[in-house]
Amino acid sequence: MAIVKCKPTSPGRRFVVKVVNKELHKGAPHAPLLEKKSKSGGRNNNGRITTRHVGGGHKQHYRLVDFRRNDKDGIPATVERIEYDPNRTAHIALLCYADGERRYIIAPKGVSAGDQLIAGALAPIKAGNSLQLRNIPVGSTIHGVELKPGKGAQIARSAGASAQLIARDGVYVTLRLRSGEMRKVLAECRATLGEVSNSEHSLRSLGKAGAKRWRGVRPTVRGVAMNPVDHPHGGGEGRTSGGRHPVSPWGFPTKGAKTRGNKRTDNMIVRRRK
């Protein structure tokens, strides 16, 4: 993995910083694990915009990633290759199981082609192996953590993400997340050892607006640049600061306002995030 700063041969190249990984597979993805991915342009079935700043971008296929790994317990797998996935910040690994089946998983950091991985209670403590939380030693770094047994990984799935198992108490274990939050999770939930690959993702710089458009991201217009009919911050004579605390176009507080409202799982949070 190398960080490459491009030479300023043009204005669009001047600020480009790329993350180059020579281990990534250069060919086509595994076709049986691809699915069609339709673009909505941020519109719903009425044609109205429900998600702003979405539209255009390169065509993509969705890669079917196995977030459970619970039906392959005890079956060893060989990592065939590490691949780029346009649908997520992390890389993905193509596994070939001893029974001949191939599946994609989130690629853990340090795992490369040729490595042997396995899931199940008897799996060794090694990056990329999947176990129930009750079988993972306290202090271990993990990712791809389930919140409900059998539902599949939900916590720590993006590039460079991880959590730490810091305590075990009865049917629960306590995890420390990257945000600083400490929360309880059922010990029968699964997790994968190690941290997610491509931790250098945050160091890249796209360099120009067009690179965002290739990814299907449209421009964001500031509220203070709009008219009063379009945004609470709009209007005014000359340039203004908006005249109130930052809000969304619909008047809800933004830029730091807390939005969590899931009281049902409040008792699972030992310490709120920082």
Swiss-Prot record:
Q: Which gene encodes it?
A: rplB
Q: What is this protein called?
A: Large ribosomal subunit protein uL2
Indicate the family of this protein: Belongs to the universal ribosomal protein uL2 family.
Q: Is Ribonucleoprotein there in the keyword field? A: yes
Pfam families linked: Ribosomal_L2, Ribosomal_L2_C
Q: How does it assemble?
A: Part of the 50S ribosomal subunit. Forms a bridge to the 30S subunit in the 70S ribosome.
Q: InterPro entries from the entry?
A: NA-bd_OB-fold (IPR012340), Rib_uL2_dom2 (IPR014722), Ribosomal_uL2 (IPR002171), Ribosomal_uL2_bac/org-type (IPR005880), Ribosomal_uL2_C (IPR022669), Ribosomal_uL2_CS (IPR022671), Ribosomal_uL2_dom3 (IPR014726), Ribosomal_uL2_RNA-bd_dom (IPR022666)
GO CC terms in record: large ribosomal subunit
Q: Which residue ranges does the record annotate as region Disordered?
A: 28-55, 224-274
